[in-house]
Structure formats: structure tokens, C-alpha cells
């Protein structure tokens, strides 16, 4: 008799994805972030569901409903802070996952990579809308500033902004639709992530060497399930340390002031995980130019496979590309820092230089380094 896990229509899918899946024997801890992202998504959906039970999407009561969750609901404070800081953990894992893909050349699997970019855009949109829901000062002004960027689109811009707002300004209609979208999008992300996984399992995983591993595969369970559980424990430890000791570390104090359309905060800025893109947006004095640079800063990932010039897949044996990659990481950290600073000298010029550096490394220097390394192979 065939084992039920291999014959049952539903259990068979789980078996082929997480148990008997042939996996390269040499994948490192950098391959843990995919499973951690899945865990983060489930955690966000669960905590978000419980928050939605007590939240009201009305401009007059939204702020007080969040306060009510923290003060009066049983363990409401931990649910709220797990959700808020869970988003930060989500983006840490997301950026590590993308970084791993760029370093080891995982972008050579085009379907998986492009669906990943779609996922990134969707997660960013979801996180942005979630930040608006507590209806604090930074929620309101962040929503106003970011949605207003759509007005830079020629001809249809102004109409588009008013259509998104549901009126002439960010108000009740905006909050209600953002709540509705923020609730539905994680389920869409879950569906798209399943397709992401489906395409990955069509080709099989990449590995640190960048070479084919068909001759050296091991079952996913128990080897990588155990490895993933270790990653999960470390993730939960970090999240709980953040939630229980300094839950507001990554938040903005301005968001503890109820939204007031008549009073603009001195420094409007998004959550920390969007600061690098915000710095790129601000580094261009022209509105349309800034919006284009902001969009390109993420869309540039779709160009990475086209700009691959090296004969080798990953950067494991490519020292020049490695230096450029870590320079890119430092550049992104610099942009993140600049995004949180006021628009004044010397921050403006540092932001502009870091933005030029960001696009130069990906579009010019990395393809050149690939060509140089190809020639070095012939020495």
C-alpha cells in the first residue's frame, strides 16, 4: 500500500513542497529567509485579524480604538506591538532574502524573481496602508504626502489623487478604503507567495556555488525543517525582545498624537523600512523626477537579470562584484539614515550622492565588474 502522504491529493502537495522535496545539500542559512517570510506573513494575518475585531475605521474613533486595544483588550498591547514590530521583522527578512538573491544570482530563475518583485510591491503597499490606520499625526501626513505623489503623473495626476482619497483630502473615505485594502491584501500576498513557491519548485533551488546540484540533493525533511525551526526560534526571540522591552523603538513619537489636518509635523517621514526609497525621492528637486526615481529604485530589480554579464551565476568566486555588493549594502544603509534626517545641508548632498551611487552600482559598475572578471578567468 502506498504511503498516504504520497497518495492523498492534498497531503501529496504538502509532501512534495516540504517533506520529500529534493534540496541542494549545501544551501546556507541565507536560504532560511523564505520560510521566515512565510512565518511572518502568517503571524501578521493572525495578529491583524484579532486587531480588526476591535478596530474601527472611522476618523473620529480610529485613534481611540487603537488606544482601547492597548489598554482594555486582554493582551491587546502585545497583539498590537507584535503586529507593528512583526512588520519590521518582515521587511528585515524581505531585504535579506532579496540581497541573497542578488548575491547568489537567484535572479537567473526569471519567473520566481519577477513574482518576487510583484510580492515586494504588494507588501510595501500593504505596510504603507497599515501605517495610516492608527490615525496619528504621522499616519495622516504620511498618507497625504505619499498619495499626493500621484499628482506628479501628467494629465491624469490630480484626478487620480482625488479618486484614491475619495474626496478633496485624506479623510474618512480614505481611511475606510485603506482598512479594507489592508485587510484583503495579505491574503492576496499569500496566494502570490504560493505561486512564487510553485515556480521555484519547477526549477529547484539555487545554491551558494551557483552550479547545478542535480547530482547532490537531499530531502527537505528532516534536514531543512530542523534548520528552519532554528531560524524561526531566532526570529521569535528577536521579535519578543523588541515587543517586550522597547516596542516603540522603531515607531514615531508623532503617531501618539491624534491626526490633525491643521498642524503639520516638523519632519514627515515613513516607517524605517521605506526610508531608503524616501531619501531617493527627496534627492531629486523635481516632483515627477523624484516619483520616477522612487519607482525605479524598486523596479530596477527587474533589470538585474538583464544586466548579468558574468560567466558565473553567483558572486561566491567574484571578488570585485562582492566588493560592489557590500558597497551597495552600505549605500542603502546610508540612504536609510538620510531618509530620517531633515532636508538641510549636509544631508541633502549626501542623499543625492548616495542616490547616484545606488543606481550607478546596479546599472553600470556591476555589469562592468562581470566583464572584467570574465577576462580574469582567462589569465
From Swiss-Prot:
GO terms for molecular function: metal ion binding; ubiquinol-cytochrome-c reductase activity. Pfam families: Cytochrom_B_C, Cytochrome_B. A ubiquinone binds at residue 201. It is a multi-pass membrane protein. GO terms for cellular component: mitochondrial inner membrane; respiratory chain complex III. Its cofactor is heme b. The keyword Lyase does not apply. Heme b b566 binds at residues 97, 196. Binds 2 heme b groups non-covalently. Heme b b562 binds at residues 83, 182. It is found in: Mitochondrion inner membrane. The chain crosses the membrane at residues 33-53, 77-98, 113-133, 178-198, 226-246, 288-308, 320-340, 347-367. SUPFAM superfamilies: a domain/subunit of cytochrome bc1 complex (Ubiquinol-cytochrome c reductase), Transmembrane di-heme cytochromes. Keywords: Electron transport, Heme, Iron, Membrane, Metal-binding, Mitochondrion, Mitochondrion inner membrane, Respiratory chain, Transmembrane, Transmembrane helix, Transport, Ubiquinone. Component of the ubiquinol-cytochrome c reductase complex (complex III or cytochrome b-c1 complex) that is part of the mitochondrial respiratory chain. The b-c1 complex mediates electron transfer from ubiquinol to cytochrome c. Contributes to the generation of a proton gradient across the mitochondrial membrane that is then used for ATP synthesis. The cytochrome bc1 complex contains 11 subunits: 3 respiratory subunits (MT-CYB, CYC1 and UQCRFS1), 2 core proteins (UQCRC1 and UQCRC2) and 6 low-molecular weight proteins (UQCRH/QCR6, UQCRB/QCR7, UQCRQ/QCR8, UQCR10/QCR9, UQCR11/QCR10 and a cleavage product of UQCRFS1). This cytochrome bc1 complex then forms a dimer. Belongs to the cytochrome b family. Heme 1 (or BL or b562) is low-potential and absorbs at about 562 nm, and heme 2 (or BH or b566) is high-potential and absorbs at about 566 nm. This is Cytochrome b. The gene is MT-CYB.
Amino acid at each position: 500500500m502506498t504511503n498516504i502522504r504520497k497518495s492523498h491529493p492534498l497531503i501529496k502537495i504538502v509532501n512534495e513542497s516540504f517533506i520529500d522535496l529534493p534540496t541542494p545539500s549545501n544551501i546556507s542559512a541565507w536560504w532560511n529567509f523564505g520560510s521566515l517570510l512565510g512565518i511572518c506573513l502568517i503571524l501578521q494575518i493572525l495578529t491583524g485579524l484579532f486587531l480588526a475585531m476591535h478596530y474601527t475605521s472611522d476618523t473620529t474613533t480610529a485613534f481611540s480604538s487603537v488606544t482601547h486595544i492597548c489598554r482594555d483588550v486582554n493582551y491587546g498591547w502585545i497583539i498590537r506591538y507584535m503586529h507593528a514590530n512583526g512588520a519590521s521583522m518582515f521587511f528585515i527578512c524581505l531585504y535579506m532574502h532579496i540581497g541573497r538573491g542578488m548575491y547568489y544570482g537567484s535572479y537567473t530563475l526569471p519567473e520566481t524573481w519577477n513574482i518576487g518583485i510583484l510580492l515586494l510591491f504588494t507588501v510595501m503597499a500593504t505596510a504603507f496602508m497599515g501605517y495610516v490606520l492608527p490615525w496619528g499625526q504621522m499616519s495622516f501626513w504620511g498618507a497625504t504626502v505619499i498619495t499626493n505623489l500621484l499628482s506628479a503623473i501628467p494629465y491624469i495626476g490630480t484626478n487620480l489623487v482625488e479618486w484614491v482619497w475619495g474626496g478633496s483630502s485624506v479623510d474618512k473615505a480614505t481611511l475606510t478604503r485603506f482598512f479594507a485594502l489592508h485587510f484583503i491584501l495579505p491574503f492576496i500576498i499569500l496566494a502570490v507567495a504560493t505561486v512564487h513557491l510553485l515556480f521555484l519548485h519547477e526549477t529547484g533551488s539555487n545554491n551558494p556555488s551557483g552550479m547545478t546540484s542535480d547530482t547532490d540533493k537531499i530531502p527537505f525533511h528532516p534536514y531543512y525543517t530542523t534548520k528552519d525551526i532554528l531560524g524561526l526560534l531566532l526570529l521569535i526571540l528577536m521579535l519578543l525582545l523588541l515587543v517586550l522591552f522597547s516596542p516603540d523603538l522603531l515607531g514615531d513619537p508623532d503617531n501618539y498624537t491624534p491626526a490633525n489636518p491643521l498642524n503639520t509635523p516638523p519632519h514627515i517621514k515613513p516607517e524605517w523600512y521605506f526610508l531608503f526609497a524616501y531619501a531617493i525621492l527627496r534627492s531629486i528637486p523635481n516632483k515627477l523626477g523624484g516619483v520616477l526615481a522612487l519607482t525605479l529604485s524598486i523596479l530596477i530589480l527587474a533589470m538585474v537579470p538583464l544586466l548579468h554579464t558574468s560567466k558565473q551565476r553567483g558572486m561566491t568566486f567574484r571578488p570585485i562584484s562582492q566588493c560592489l555588493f557590500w558597497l551597495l549594502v552600505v549605500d542603502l544603509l546610508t540612504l536609510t539614515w538620510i531618509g530620517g534626517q531633515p532636508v538641510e545641508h549636509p544631508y541633502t548632498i549626501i542623499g543625492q550622492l548616495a542616490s547616484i551611487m545606488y543606481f550607478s552600482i546596479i546599472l553600470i559598475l556591476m555589469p562592468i565588474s562581470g566583464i572584467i572578471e570574465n577576462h580574469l578567468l582567462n589569465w
